[in-house]
């Protein structure tokens, strides 16, 4: 392995040197494009808190200018030496090389970690980036750090070795010397450092590349001064850093302000480099990661070159690895530098490392060293991969390698103190302070990772704004290649700490889903590629880490899982964070706004877990996870519901949706983390099992990662997602979604799918459909019944439908709806059946009453109306076809008509004139009687023409029918008037006669349509006027002349038959009245039959005895009745009429007038028959074509018959 790594290292070193030179040139060009001195932010991102934070950071990290010079002078020579020595050493030394890599990575991590601190201060001052040296250094000095890298790196190596030795002692004491070096690094990394170490390594690599290209100038001067300052500050600032971090974390209430600035600074740096306004989004945290990416790319190139130059520095870092246990991050930085330097190396690493990752992943999961190694792997990976990573890393490209060197030293000291403090704090779980310290103090890995993600962004933004835009441009480019790989994984850890506080604020304020999307999408390729290197490197590192005490591996394993899910922050932060990430990330995903409490607790838990994991094996890690779950439980009460459905957490996944495509590669590690995260989310109350499972799964995940080393970029993507998460819990969720795409995404999608199903809109639509069906069915059955029934049924069905719809909506149960529908259908069916039965029964009853009424009426008419026996027979036949309704209405209308009609008749001698003024009741009855008398056929025939739809004339159509009848009546009346006017204008008598006859037919149709109208003009009056018109037409020519032509005779026959049938229609209209009068008069005559004298009626009247037969005194009874000489009854004793009841007189007159219509009809019919004999052929053909016309024929038949006859006449050669 060592030999293989050595070969890789040599090749990579060469590639790195070339790449660094190239990238330095590019970085310089790009830096020229971007003013170096241009302030990152027009205004300080933060005011009061930012100043306070920057002061603390300066105190912790030292003055930026001093550190810049110190680091540049220090890191540049070492980087050159390191790069030279490195080639000879295995690219991925199992023990020593890795230790060296870990040392440099830890240095980088510290540098990156410091950027986190500086990030907060840097965020407040735009121009402060240069003023707050330590804060700005992370971003501004990536190249400077790289320049000074070797010196600070060595010093940091010593520091980090001291720190790592402490952690390594805690974590594991049974590893080989190289492994011990690595293990201290790894152990320090696993605690807080591991996640950060990748970032640091990336920072260191960036610093190397940049220092080789840009910072080599001030390398020596800045090196010594800055190295000393960095060491002193690191030693002095560990507590200060911890304080600052703790203040950030301890101010969870203020996380938005304190925690937020660090992420914003990266975002700001990125914004300054890419978009000047992006700094505004630093509050979003990771939103601006993508913004940083462009500038980071430039630093990455420099970084790649510097990483080549830094092999010697890495070697010293190796020697000082024990100290650099925290600097194991710096070791990672060298690796990341190499990774960033050589894309080809990264590709090679990607290809070669997958198996090592499998072996290493499980043990080194807890160790951030694997991140540095993955960084190396990316270096081995082809330059294309490196450039891809570079490209992807721009947002992560942090010129922190140089800064990282000085800041790494500061951070190493801070990390040592912070780690101890973090461990204490984690143990304590002050969730507010812990999260800030978690990002910076808690896990140096976290701090490094945070620096890598958040700080990398912050420092990158700062550096892009100032000198870092020059030195960091090249370094960023190189680091972006290398760091992104490492930073991807470590980044998730910074997200853990910053994520807890900052993300809480960000989740509430700037839900980092956008940052995640932009950053994840922008960096996704970088992270994926880098994560390949990171995953491979991490697997290698994990392998040495696995050699290192189990605590390291456990912590790294935890990190691996957390990395895996691209929840990188939580996972990479610490092993506990990994556990926490499961809980915390889901929680963050579900409760982006609630993360503040939970995240602080988690950050502390992460620090504790990392501290504990360092000394503890997997078992202890599980314990730590248990403890951490407790911390999570604090924040988790909110997230329990949301975390448990972490698969459903996809709610935040919408934000993660974009990142998801990125994490497809990181799926294995994300799966691991997802598994652990899912377990905690499923068992929030039992976080320990999830964490245990996370720890147990970590090996599996490591294996998965090794298998998916090609998916390593996904790890880095997760890290990047984690860093994005730092800006918000949603980002963590997104990372998680990315990692868990296979597992988590499905739950998320399922959750989304479930929610739509819960909405249950289909039931409503079903209800609507059912309603439509019911409506269609209801009208049909109702059509059989009477219209009122239809309306009622419709109302019932509508009510039922509404009820059923309401119930179905309430229950949202299709079954219930179906049942209701069935009930509705059954009800509708029952209603329909009931309506049909009722209709049938009513029809049968009507028929029976009809038969009875006609019989009685016919008997009465026969008894009282002997003279018009024929008329009585006709009336009886017609009445037999008529309904009994008229009979039922007879009493009142008859009385009214009897009382009112006589006065009318007295006023006029014509019965026709008396009838029209009759009351409405009488008119209605007359209409009914007319229909009855006209025979069922006539009534039925009338229906086709807007005639009332009364087959027998017994039932009056409903209101709708009345309206249509009225419309039809008006229409026919207009047509009749038009034809009449035309006829009047015509000169030809024959043509005029024909036109008049056509008008007559229209009048007849109007009368038929008006029969159903009770309040409309009486059909009786229409028929009467029509008869008058026919008489006028007949008067135009003398049709009695035998010499008239056959056409005229035929025309005369048609006119006579029309008159005859119209008379019959008039009789039918008054039939009910006539029948009543007949009964009344017969009774009256019976009572007076004792008087044998003819004037008996008159005598009775003269006696003044009121007629007992009178049903009721008519209103007209009070009116003095005058004898009507013209009455058909022709009372003999006119003078005695005064004593005769007026009602009897009126009834007698009306009776005679109405019955006279029947007589007239017969007379006219006979005349027509006489004329027909002369033209039998014509009428025979007409009858054959239409139908035989008779006295009892309906008016409809008459109209049809007459029209056909007129048509034939017109068509005949002799026609008019």
Curated annotation (Swiss-Prot):
Residues recorded with modification Phosphoserine: 183, 191, 197, 755, 760
Keyword Membrane annotated: no
Region annotated Disordered, chain positions: 1-52, 68-104, 116-139, 152-217, 244-275, 352-728, 777-969, 1094-1125
Extent of Pro residues compositional bias: 252-266, 429-438
Chain segments annotated as coiled-coil in the UniProt record: none
Residue numbers of N6-acetyllysine PTMs: 682
Cited InterPro entries: AF4/FMR2, AF4/FMR2_CHD, AF4_int
Compositional bias segments (type: Polar residues): 383-406
Gene Ontology CC, one term: nucleus
GO molecular function, one term: DNA-binding transcription factor activity
Any one GO biological process: DNA-templated transcription
Keywords: Acetylation, Nucleus, Phosphoprotein, Proto-oncogene
Compartments, record wording: Nucleus
Start-end of Low complexity biased regions: 207-217, 710-728, 824-846, 867-886, 902-915, 1115-1125
Principal place of residence: nucleus
Residue ranges with Basic and acidic residues bias: 9-35, 78-99, 166-182, 789-808
Regions of compositional bias (Acidic residues) in chain numbering: 408-424, 457-484
Subunit structure: Component of the super elongation complex (SEC), at least composed of EAF1, EAF2, CDK9, MLLT3/AF9, AFF (AFF1 or AFF4), the P-TEFb complex and ELL (ELL, ELL2 or ELL3).
Family the UniProt entry places it in: Belongs to the AF4 family.
Protein name: AF4/FMR2 family member 1
Organism: Mus musculus
């Amino acid at each position: 392995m060592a030999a293989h790594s050595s070969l890789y290292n040599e090749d990579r070193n060469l590639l790195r040197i070339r790449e660094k030179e190239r990238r330095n040139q590019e970085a310089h060009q790009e830096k020229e494009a971007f003013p170096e001195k241009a302030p990152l932010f027009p205004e300080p991102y933060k005011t009061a808190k930012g100043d306070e934070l920057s002061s603390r950071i300066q105190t912790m990290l030292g003055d930026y200018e001093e550190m810049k010079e110190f680091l540049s002078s220090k890191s540049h020579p070492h980087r050159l030496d390191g790069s030279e020595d490195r080639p000879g050493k295995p690219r991925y030394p199992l023990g020593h090389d890795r230790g060296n890599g870990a040392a440099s990575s830890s240095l980088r991590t510290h540098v990156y970690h410091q950027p986190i601190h500086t990030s907060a201060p840097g965020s407040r001052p735009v121009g402060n980036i240069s003023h707050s040296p330590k804060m700005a250094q992370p971003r501004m000095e990536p190249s400077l750090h790289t320049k000074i890298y070797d010196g600070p790196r060595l010093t940091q190596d010593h520091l980090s070795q001291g720190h790592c030795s402490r952690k390594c002692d805690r974590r594991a004491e049974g590893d080989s010397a190289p492994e011990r070096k690595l293990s201290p690094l790894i152990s320090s990394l696993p605690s807080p450092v591991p996640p950060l170490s990748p970032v640091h390594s990336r920072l260191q690599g960036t610093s190397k590349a940049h220092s080789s290209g840009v910072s080599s100038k001030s390398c020596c001067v800045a090196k010594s001064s800055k190295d000393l300052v960095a060491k002193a500050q690191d030693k002095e600032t560990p507590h200060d850093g911890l304080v600052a971090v703790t203040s950030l974390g301890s101010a969870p209430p203020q996380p938005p302000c304190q925690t937020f600035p660090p992420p914003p600074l990266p975002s700001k740096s990125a914004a300054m480099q890419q978009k000047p306004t992006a700094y505004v989004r630093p509050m979003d945290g990771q939103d601006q990661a993508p913004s940083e990416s462009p500038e980071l790319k430039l630093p990455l190139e420099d970084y790649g070159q510097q990483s080549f130059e830094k092999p010697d520095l890495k070697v010293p870092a190796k020697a000082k690895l024990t100290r650099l246990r925290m600097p194991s991050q710096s070791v990672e930085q060298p690796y990341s530098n190499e990774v960033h330097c050589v894309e080809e190396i990264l590709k090679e690493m990607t290809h070669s490392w997958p198996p090592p990752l499998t072996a290493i992943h499980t043990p080194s999961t807890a160790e951030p060293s694997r991140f540095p190694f993955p960084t190396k792997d990316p270096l081995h990976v082809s330059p294309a991969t490196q450039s891809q990573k570079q490209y992807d890393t721009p947002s992560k490209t942090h010129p922190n390698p140089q800064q990282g060197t000085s800041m790494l030293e500061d951070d190493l000291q801070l990390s040592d103190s912070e780690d101890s403090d973090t461990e204490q704090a984690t143990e304590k779980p002050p969730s507010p302070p812990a999260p800030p310290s978690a990002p910076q103090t808690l896990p140096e890995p976290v701090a490094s990772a945070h620096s890598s993600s958040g700080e990398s962004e912050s420092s990158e933004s700062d550096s892009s704004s100032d000198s870092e835009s020059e030195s960091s441009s090249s370094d960023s480019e190189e680091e972006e290649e290398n760091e992104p790989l490492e930073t991807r994984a470590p980044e998730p850890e910074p997200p853990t700490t910053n994520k807890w506080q900052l993300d809480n604020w960000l989740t509430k304020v700037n839900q980092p889903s956008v940052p995640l999307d932009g950053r994840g999408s922008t960096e996704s390729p970088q992270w994926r590629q880098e994560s390949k290197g990171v995953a491979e490197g991490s697997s290698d590192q994990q392998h040495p880490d696995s050699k290192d005490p189990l605590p390291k591996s456990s912590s790294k394993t935890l990190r691996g899982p957390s990395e895996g899910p691209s929840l990188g922050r939580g996972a990479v932060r610490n092993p506990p964070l990994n556990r926490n990430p499961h809980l915390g990330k889901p929680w963050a995903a579900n409760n982006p706004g609630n993360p503040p409490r939970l995240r602080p607790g988690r950050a502390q838990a992460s620090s504790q877990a990392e501290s504990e994991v360092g000394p503890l094996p997997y078992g202890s890690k599980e314990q730590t996870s248990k403890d951490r779950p407790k911390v999570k439980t604090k924040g988790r009460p909110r997230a329990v519901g949301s975390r448990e459905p972490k698969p459903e957490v996809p709610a935040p996944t919408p934000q993660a949706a974009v990142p998801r495509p990125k994490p497809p590669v990181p799926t294995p590690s994300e799966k691991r983390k997802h598994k652990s995260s899912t377990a905690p989310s499923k068992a929030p109350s039992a976080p320990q099992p999830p964490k245990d499972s996370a720890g147990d799964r970590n090996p599996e995940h490591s294996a998965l990662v090794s298998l998916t080393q090609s998916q390593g970029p996904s790890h880095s993507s997760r890290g990047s997602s984690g860093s994005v998460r730092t800006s918000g819990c949603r980002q963590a969720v997104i990372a998680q979604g990315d990692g868990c795409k296979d597992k988590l995404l499905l739950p998320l999608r399922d959750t989304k799918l479930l929610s739509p199903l819960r909405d249950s809109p289909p039931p409503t639509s079903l209800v609507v459909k059912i309603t439509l069906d019911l409506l269609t069915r209801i009208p049909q059955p109702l059509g059989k019944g009477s219209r009122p029934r239809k309306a009622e049924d419709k109302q019932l069905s509508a009510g039922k439908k509404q009820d059923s719809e309401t119930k179905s909506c309430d229950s949202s149960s299709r079954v219930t709806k179906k049942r209701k529908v069935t009930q509705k259908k059954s009800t509708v069916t029952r209603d329909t059946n009931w309506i049909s039965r009722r209709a049938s029964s009513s029809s049968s009853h009507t028929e029976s009453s009809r038969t009875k009424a006609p019989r009685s009426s016919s008997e009465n008419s026969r008894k009282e109306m002997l003279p018009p026996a024929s008329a009585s027979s006709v009336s009886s036949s017609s009445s037999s076809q008529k309904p009994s309704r008229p009979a039922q209405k007879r009493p009142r209308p008859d009385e009214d008509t009897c009382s009112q009609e006589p006065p009318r008749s007295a006023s006029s001698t014509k019965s026709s004139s008396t009838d029209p003024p009759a009351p409405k009741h009488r008119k209605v009855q007359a209409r009914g009687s007319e229909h009855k008398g006209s025979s069922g056929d006539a009534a039925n025939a009338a229906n086709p023409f807007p005639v009332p739809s009364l087959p027998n004339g017994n039932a009056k159509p409903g209101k709708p029918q009345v309206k249509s009848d009225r419309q039809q009546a008006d229409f026919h009346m207009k047509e009749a008037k038009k034809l009449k006017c035309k006829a009047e204008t015509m000169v030809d008598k024959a043509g005029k006669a024909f036109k008049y006859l056509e008008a007559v037919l229209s009048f007849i149709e109007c009368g038929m349509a008006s029969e159903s109208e009770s309040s409309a003009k009486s059909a009786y009056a229409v028929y009467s006027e029509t008869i008058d018109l026919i008489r006028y037409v007949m008067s135009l020519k003398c049709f009695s002349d035998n010499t008239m032509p056959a056409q005229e005779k035929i025309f005369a026959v048609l006119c006579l038959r029309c008159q005859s049938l119209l008379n019959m229609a008039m009789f039918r209209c008054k039939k009910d009245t006539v029948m009543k009068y007949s009964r009344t008069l017969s009774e009256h005559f019976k009572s007076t039959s004792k008087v044998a004298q003819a004037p008996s009626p008159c005598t009775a009247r003269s006696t003044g005895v009121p007629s007992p037969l009178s049903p009721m005194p008519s209103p007209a009874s009070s009116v003095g009745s005058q004898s009507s000489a013209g009455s058909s009854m022709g009372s003999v004793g006119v003078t005695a009429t005064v004593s005769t009841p007026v009602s009897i007189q009126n009834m007698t007159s009306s009776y005679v007038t109405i019955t006279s219509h029947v007589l007239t009809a017969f007379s006219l019919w006979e005349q027509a028959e006489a004329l027909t004999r002369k033209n039998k052929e014509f009428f025979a053909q007409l009858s054959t074509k239409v139908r035989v016309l008779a006295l009892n024929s309906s008016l409809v038949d008459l109209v049809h018959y007459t029209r056909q006859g007129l048509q034939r006449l017109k068509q005949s050669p002799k026609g008019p």
